[in-house]
Amino acid sequence: HLGVGQRYNARFEGGSNEFRWSTDLQYKDTEGAMKGSSRKNFNGGITLLYKFKTLTFRNYTSIGINHSDESNYGSFSDYVRMQPYNTPYDKNGVLRMFLEPFSAIEDGIENPLYNAALNTINSKDYKMLTNNFSVDWNILPYLTMRGQLGVSNTVSTSDYFLPAEHTYFSSPNRNGEYDTPEGYMRRGLYRYGNTESTTFNADVTLAFNKIFAERHSLYAGVNWSLLTSKSDGFNIALEGFANSDAPKIANARQHATNIMPSGNNSTRHQFGVTGNVNYTYNSRYYLDLSYRVDGNSMYGSKEKYSSFWSTGLGWNVHQEDFIKNIKELNMLRLK
């Protein structure tokens, strides 16, 4: 089987000097080398921009959807183990559950073609929705302020189902676990996982940038940022599906034996303030200073805040007259 794919892209835009809009659409469908395996991706986004005097408003909304299916014919390694004398059908043309071993002391190999004819499920889904809104304010030619607010939500799910007729429950590797009267009632397995996370972030930046007396360049900026995120997830395994044509969680007989449900829940809050100062003299020498204070709920109750600072000096040697005449050298900087 040869895996092929297709991909489509589209972009539309329009508007006026004050108001602009654009939208992007992408779709990609890829088939795997194994029959039945595929990856489908869709991404879309829309951007809105509006200018009013010294204010610029922007909003970007995007959505991403991914769906993947694994082949019900098994993995490539299942076929690597096959021998030329293995036949998937018996003399009556019926699919074998297990391929005949070479000798009596060997166990039969599970027939992937037999399992492919069953109603198995092995898929994953992922969805992400994001919205970012920002405002730029040109207070003065050398003084600007920018505010941004963002929110994103992601949901991922996984489904894995083996019907009662699957060779998994009759394999010698199970040591007869599903061959007892109670074991027969437990045949059929469904694993389901779900994780959802939501993130909010906001930040405000005030920036000053001006040149004095044609030689002195000064930049100073302050940024305030806030982030909060929450994540919830769980995984369950159920067994005992009498009807293979109705692989629904509600049709399970019980929770899977020896497989406990699991879950996780986490919440994080973060706050930070950053200050930066940069001074440059005649495009030759410069000084950088920065300081940041971080507050994070992950730090613990005793030390909720931490601070960082840095400083740096630099010399743009390529701006010196004795270097400008060297054509082979266009940049040389010492820090």
Predicted regions, residues:
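Surface-exposed loop/interface segments of Gram-negative outer-membrane beta-barrel transport/assembly proteins
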Residues: 1, 32-34, 43-130, 146-148, ...
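Short glycine-rich loop/turn motifs
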Residues: 201, 270-276, 284-286
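Predominantly transmembrane beta-strands of Gram-negative outer membrane beta-barrel pores used
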Residues: 7-29, 33, 43-51, 58-60, ...
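Residues embedded in well-ordered regular secondary structure
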Residues: 1-35, 72-75, 115-119, 136-138
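Membrane-spanning beta-strand positions in outer-membrane beta-barrel proteins
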Residues: 9, 20-24, 56-60, 134, ...
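Transmembrane beta-strand segments that form the barrel wall of outer-membrane beta-barrel proteins
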Residues: 25-31, 287-296
